[in-house]
Amino acid sequence: MGRSLKKGPFISDSLLRKIEKQNSNDDKAVIKTWSRASTILPLMIGHTIAVHNGKSHIPVFITEQMVGHKLGEFAPTRTYRGHIRDKKGAR
């Protein structure tokens, strides 16, 4: 279930300020953020945002197809190491 249209998309205030500052200076430095719940807006296209996954920051380059999604969708929090093998082997 999505967010109400009258409220608009959520984006962290500090993240929005950093992006607007870089857009005005034509700067494309990596922006670190812990705000995984922030929605990707069209003004973020072309920026690289380092999203925290609980352990480290994962760099995410924003493209047009990502607009409307959340930042956390592109920084997985769990590592999949495969299913456990049968220790007894084939009999």
Swiss-Prot record:
Sequence similarity: Belongs to the universal ribosomal protein uS19 family.
InterPro entries tied to this protein: Ribosomal_uS19, Ribosomal_uS19_bac-type, Ribosomal_uS19_CS, Ribosomal_uS19_SF
Xref: SUPFAM superfamilies: Ribosomal protein S19 (SSF54570)
Keyword presence, Ribosomal protein: yes
Keywords of this entry: Ribonucleoprotein, Ribosomal protein, RNA-binding, rRNA-binding
GO CC terms, sorted: cytoplasm; small ribosomal subunit
ATP-binding among keywords: no
Cited function: Protein S19 forms a complex with S13 that binds strongly to the 16S ribosomal RNA.
GO-annotated biological processes: ribosomal small subunit assembly; translation
Name of this chain's protein: Small ribosomal subunit protein uS19
Domain of life where this protein originates: Bacteria
NCBIfam families: rpsS_bact
MF GO annotations: rRNA binding; structural constituent of ribosome
